[in-house]
A protein has these predicted regions:
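Short, glycine/charged-enriched hinge/interface segments at domain edges or termini
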Residues: 11, 64-165
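Short, low-complexity N-terminal leaders and the immediately following helix N-cap/first helix
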Residues: 1-74, 147
Length: 165
């Protein structure tokens, strides 16, 4: 004789379907505070209310410039720009980059008004004893800039249904 259990009272397929259908496998959604949301599952899609990041930012250390000021610049014939300030990550820029100007900028810092590109520090030389920087490469608008909304744009899906928080 075997130690194996035998199940003689099996449910019919109809009974099995009825038993499964009676389970509450699709609970009603409920709203909870953010403090209580950890480990919960989203019932529906969540769209971003705002751009992330909410500003254009530098994707590397260097100088915020107007790309048009670097047109034709190269190692043999650099563009020379006036240094008008510094922008640090986490700080609001207090400088405007005008024609022929640049601002030193840290990775992740907000791009100052007037600038539309960032040149990496390795492609520059500070002019000794002057507030001027030589740019040894040409840039296009948007070079080394992460635009506002690059991670998630306002109105785009931030989280989908069934996402665990």
């Amino acid at each position: 004789m075997s130690d194996r259990k035998e199940f003689r009272d099996l449910a019919t397929p109809a009974e099995a379907h009825e038993a499964i259908a009676s389970l509450n496998l699709d609970p009603e959604p409920e709203t909870v505070s953010l403090d209580d949301a950890r480990g919960r599952i989203l019932a529906e899609r969540v769209d971003a209310d705002l751009d992330v990041p909410g500003f254009d930012r530098a994707s590397m250390d260097g100088y915020a410039v107007r790309a048009s000021d670097t047109f034709g610049a190269d190692e043999a014939d650099p563009a020379t720009l006036e240094l008008v300030g510094t922008v640090h990550a986490g700080a609001e820029p207090d400088v405007f980059v005008g024609d022929g100007e640049c601002a030193e900028i840290s990775t992740g810092a907000v791009l100052p008004d007037g600038a539309d590109a960032v040149v990496m520090v390795e492609k520059t030389d500070e002019v000794p004893d002057e507030e001027r920087v030589e740019i040894r490469t040409s840039l296009a608008p948007g070079d080394a800039v992460m635009p506002a909304g690059a991670d998630i744009a306002a109105g785009q899906r931030a989280f989908g249904p069934d996402t665990e928080l």
